[in-house]
């Protein structure tokens, strides 16, 4: 039976199914509260990738749910951004609180000035990027970066914590 996996922090070699993330986070004393969720850049930012994330956002919005953490989406190109805007996907993502960034590398390569976390402060982020080594995204070596699919990132943004299992837990 297949189950979505989350990898990290600091390496893609630390993979576990979403059902094991809570135990792993507690056992390793990772900060359980997610400080930010990010989708896109060049990886996992195609029309299809963002469309799957937008579908989950649309369903969540039907029930009045919002992301519990800052959620940033970076379309892979201007063509992708224009197409997801045309087809209503941007509206779906924004309806749960997402901010759509410019079509650029941005946080994936460390071009992210964070005011919410002090340098050296341990925190957890979740992204659909393909890199998660220390200081990669925000210049803070204490940021623990976990990687998942765009759909998993949306699920965790809605839950707000690493111990939220979007396959079995409920939101109100």
Which stretches of residues belong to each language-model region?
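Fe-S-dependent hydro-lyases/dehydratases of central metabolism
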Residues: 1-172
């Amino acid at each position: 039976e297949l189950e979505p996996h989350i990898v990290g922090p600091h390496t893609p070699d630390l993979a576990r199914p979403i059902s094991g993330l809570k135990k792993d986070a507690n056992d390793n004393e990772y900060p359980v509260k997610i400080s930010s969720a990010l989708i896109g850049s060049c990886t996992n930012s195609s029309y299809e990738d963002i469309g799957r994330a937008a579908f989950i956002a649309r369903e969540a919005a039907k029930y009045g749910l919002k992301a519990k953490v800052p959620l940033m989406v970076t379309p892979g190109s201007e063509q992708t951004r224009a197409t997801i805007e045309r087809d209503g996907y941007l509206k779906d993502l924004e309806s749960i609180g997402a901010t759509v960034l410019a079509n650029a590398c941005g946080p994936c390569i460390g071009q992210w000035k964070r005011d919410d976390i002090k340098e050296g402060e341990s925190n957890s982020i979740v992204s659909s990027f393909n890199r998660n080594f220390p200081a990669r995204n925000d210049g803070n070596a204490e940021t623990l970066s976990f990687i998942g699919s765009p759909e998993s990132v949306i699920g965790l943004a809605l839950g707000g914590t690493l111990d939220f299992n979007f396959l079995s837990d409920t939101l109100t």
